[in-house]
Amino acid sequence: MTATQPVHLVRPAPVHVHPSSERWSVEAIEALFALPFNDLIFRAQQVHREHFDANAVQRSTLLSIKTGGCPEDCAYCPQSVHHDTGVEADKLMDVATVRQAAQAAAAAGATRFCMGAAWREPKDRDIEKVVELVREVKSLGLEACCTLGMLSKPQAQALKEAGVDYYNHNLDTAPEAYGRIISTRVYEERLQTLAHVRDAGMNVCCGGIVGMGESRRERAGLVAQLANLDPHPESVPINELVQVEGTPLAGSDKLDPFEFVRTIAVARITMPTAYVRLSAGRQEMGDAIQALCFLAGANSIFYGDKLLTTGNPDVERDEALFERLGLTSA
């Protein structure tokens, strides 16, 4: 970590939980995690089949439209100005470049095009430019998703009016672990942005990252926060930490792969109608672990060889895996 002082340095504030949060207590979710592996996977697969085609997987493509230079100090992120990772700050992509990427994604079979920008919170003039990009993506018949940082209520409304279908804003981890991961944004601010997204009428995409040194109880706490949003997110990306040299979490102990599969299963059981997405970390997963994740209820992936600044399985590998497993595109 560099000597640069964090921007907007604040301490994590108390989390205001929706009254419906008692629907899933942390203890109840811990009990799911503790089930024998076969019993947990069987239960998750039962829930999955009640709501989805068990052999269909939705494909999204993620493009970094503005990379690096983020003032946040997230301990996992190579785009933070506080970490020396070699990621250079870029300007916002132009319409022609985004159009070309979206066309390639559609041709490869993606149905949703996600655009990510390394901002703490976009300025209104940034939103105006993103609106142009969204309209271009929508003109190609793709669903549009954005992840731009914190939003004001008017900004969320502007994105909705432009045609954004999903807005991603992750909780990252449980409230109890949050202060170890980031100090430049409080948990309540994340929840407030999610409320603005929901009020504007966009679908909520919200998940977190596992493998950051958290305990199982803290993983259960993250799932509880997600499941107790009212309603729960329509899309839930579950990321496994990708360790990047120069970030504070580089060199962390690896998460047991079966614990990752358990997290997928618990997310499926507690959020039965959500698309549970295998997100960052897939490149290092073996095919057998990915297959177990699909069995546990994962039904969405990021498709393409790059996720923002980190690697992802190439299209050919995914196509081969889908064929071996008999999976189709949702």
From Swiss-Prot:
Catalytic activity: (4R,5S)-dethiobiotin + (sulfur carrier)-SH + 2 reduced [2Fe-2S]-[ferredoxin] + 2 S-adenosyl-L-methionine = (sulfur carrier)-H + biotin + 2 5'-deoxyadenosine + 2 L-methionine + 2 oxidized [2Fe-2S]-[ferredoxin]
Assigned keywords, A-Z: 2Fe-2S, 4Fe-4S, Biotin biosynthesis, Iron, Iron-sulfur, Metal-binding, S-adenosyl-L-methionine, Transferase
Gene3D superfamilies with a match to the protein in the record: Aldolase class I
HAMAP family named among the record's database cross-references: BioB
Pathway named in the protein's UniProt entry: Cofactor biosynthesis; biotin biosynthesis; biotin from 7,8-diaminononanoate: step 2/2
Class of the enzyme per the UniProt entry, highest EC level: transferase
GO terms of molecular function: 2 iron, 2 sulfur cluster binding; 4 iron, 4 sulfur cluster binding; biotin synthase activity; iron ion binding
Gene that encodes the chain: bioB
Domain Radical SAM core: 55-282
E.C. no: 2.8.1.6
A Pfam entry, by short name: Radical_SAM
Record has Transferase as a keyword: yes
Family: Belongs to the radical SAM superfamily. Biotin synthase family.
Binding site for [4Fe-4S] cluster: 70, 74, 77
Function of the protein: Catalyzes the conversion of dethiobiotin (DTB) to biotin by the insertion of a sulfur atom into dethiobiotin via a radical-based mechanism.
GO biological process, one term: biotin biosynthetic process
Binding site for [2Fe-2S] cluster: 114, 145, 205, 277
Record bears the keyword Ribonucleoprotein: no
Note accompanying the cofactor annotation: Binds 1 [4Fe-4S] cluster. The cluster is coordinated with 3 cysteines and an exchangeable S-adenosyl-L-methionine.
Cofactors (names): [4Fe-4S] cluster; [2Fe-2S] cluster
Name this protein carries in UniProt: Biotin synthase
